[in-house]
């Protein structure tokens, strides 16, 4: 087994992973709740980039409902962003599962 070859391959994998992590900020997913009353857009780093709330969802007498809708939309977006990030990183690593790499 050629150690130099393994080291070169490890460097290539490291570079591919670093590039893929940078590209996660460019991924975009959208999730909604309440039949579209609340929409969240998130990047592959699980950062919220946009939050839209339909005026129909804003009822001062029912603040808890809006909070629940926002929570549900954010959680759905996180799930989608993690799945997209996992898929993106799997392509970058050739399908090699590396714990803690994605999302």
From Swiss-Prot:
InterPro entries: YbaB-like_sf (IPR036894), YbaB/EbfC (IPR004401)
Gene Ontology terms: cellular component: bacterial nucleoid; cytosol
Domain of life, source organism: Bacteria
Location of the protein in the cell: Cytoplasm, Nucleoid
GO molecular function term, any single one: DNA binding
Keyword line: Cytoplasm, DNA-binding
Principal cellular location given in the protein's record: cytoplasm
Similarity annotation: Belongs to the YbaB/EbfC family.
Role this protein plays: Binds to DNA and alters its conformation. May be involved in regulation of gene expression, nucleoid organization and DNA protection.
Quaternary context: Homodimer.
Protein name per its UniProtKB record: Nucleoid-associated protein Anae109_3761
């Amino acid at each position: 087994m050629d150690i130099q070859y393994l080291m070169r391959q490890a460097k290539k994998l490291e570079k591919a992973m670093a590039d893929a992590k940078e590209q996660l900020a460019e991924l975009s997913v959208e999730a909604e709740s309440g039949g579209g009353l609340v929409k969240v857009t998130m990047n592959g780093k699980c950062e919220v980039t946009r939050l839209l709330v339909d005026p129909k969802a804003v009822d001062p007498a029912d603040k808890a409902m809006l909070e629940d809708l926002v929570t549900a939309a954010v959680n759905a977006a996180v799930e989608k962003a993690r799945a997209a990030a996992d898929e993106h990183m799997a392509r970058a690593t050739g399908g090699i599962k590396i714990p803690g790499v994605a999302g």
